[in-house]
Design a protein with these regions (language model features):
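Eukaryotic scaffold repeat domains enriched in small/polar residues
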Residues: 1-331
Length: 331
């Protein structure tokens, strides 16, 4: 197969901070796009913002799944979301250490998991991948990947804390290639590792050939049909793109403008609108601190924590601290 050449062009962004519920997010942790291109965002924060918000890239808000709490179907810190072959939604909660399965309409089917370090237990599950009715769970603080049936029966695990080629240190995101291989964002080791679906090491990327920056605390990874990798590089506050051989292709820092939700908010808050229009960033700290720069330059990514692709290959980058995601289309 000949890989299709592309560049990424900024399209739009969706979201703004809210603690009132309804449209908007608070400290979102993960993003996924269903086959019909409906966008699902795991929103945390507190109270009415906790759950999985559903939106379209046309700024439609469809409501949310789940609510704050510990009962079945509720959430405290939803950390990862994924879909199976019949579009059931799976939600990992790193506070409750469990996985909950919802049907297409958002009704609870079942949940499973508990805190611990034994097989079948979790310590902060942060990533989900579902393939051929197998659920792969990134068990972050146990430094391992676990495999389950869709009903929650334990199958296998691999990993273990360390920096060797087949070890993990606080892994975060996960995705799958077309040939069955699996990519894991190995946050603590500043790399993305490629495994077979049985956990055998294939390769890794620390710094792609031609890249300006080595990976620094990668939070999540997505892969397209040509095995190009899209990495939410949390430590560098960028999106990095590599080909299947680890060659650097592109890097994005963020280009967001005010989206319609934010514009509508400012129309009702004229004092804030005037203050924003006259704001000039002042750096009183070391500007080599990329997070400090991100915090003060609104178009930039501020803590990019998750990345997803839709059926057309568009790229969605979720930012925890700006409570939004930016969309880039291929051209």
């Amino acid at each position: 197969m000949v890989a299709t050449k592309f560049t990424l062009k900024y399209s739009s962004n969706i979201g703004f901070a809210t603690d009132q519920g309804g449209r908007g997010f608070q400290l979102p942790a993960h993003i996924a796009v269903r086959s019909d291109n409906r966008i699902f965002v795991a929103s945390r924060g507190r109270g009415p913002t906790v759950g999985v918000q559903m939106v379209s890239r046309d700024f439609e808000f469809f409501g949310k799944i789940g609510s704050q709490g510990k009962a079945t179907g509720q959430m405290i810190e939803p950390s990862a979301i994924a879909f199976d072959s019949v579009e059931n939604l799976y939600v990992a909660d790193e506070k409750l250490n469990r996985i909950t399965r919802f049907d297409y309409e958002g009704e609870v089917i079942d949940s499973w998991g508990e805190a611990g370090s034994e097989p079948g237990q979790f310590d902060h599950p942060t990533g989900l991948l579902i393939r051929d009715e197998i659920v792969f769970v990134v068990d972050a603080l146990n430094n391992r990947i676990q495999k389950y049936t869709t009903s929650g029966d334990f199958i296998d695990q691999w990993g273990g804390q360390g920096s060797s080629r087949d070890s993990l240190k606080y892994p975060w995101g996960i995705t799958g290639a077309a040939n069955g291989d699996i990519f894991v964002a190995d946050w603590g080791n500043d790399r993305v590792i490629r495994f077979t679906e049985d956990g055998q090491f294939v390769s890794d990327i620390h710094k792609g050939q031609g890249a300006e920056l080595p990976l620094n605390r990668p939070a999540d990874v997505a892969v397209d049909q040509d095995d190009n990798l899209f990495v939410a590089d949390w430590g560098n506050q960028v999106l990095q793109v590599f080909d299947e051989n680890g060659n650097f292709l592109d890097m994005k820092r963020g280009e967001a403008d005010l989206n319609p939700w934010a514009l509508q908010y400012f129309e009702s808050q004229q004092d804030e609108k005037r203050a924003r229009s006259s704001y000039v960033p002042v750096f009183e700290t070391n500007t080599d601190d990329v997070r400090e720069v991100s915090a003060r330059i609104e178009p930039f990514f501020w803590d990019p924590c998750s990345v997803a692709l839709d059926e057309n290959g568009s790229v969605y980058v979720l930012e925890t601290c700006r409570h939004r995601f930016q969309i880039f289309d291929r051209v």
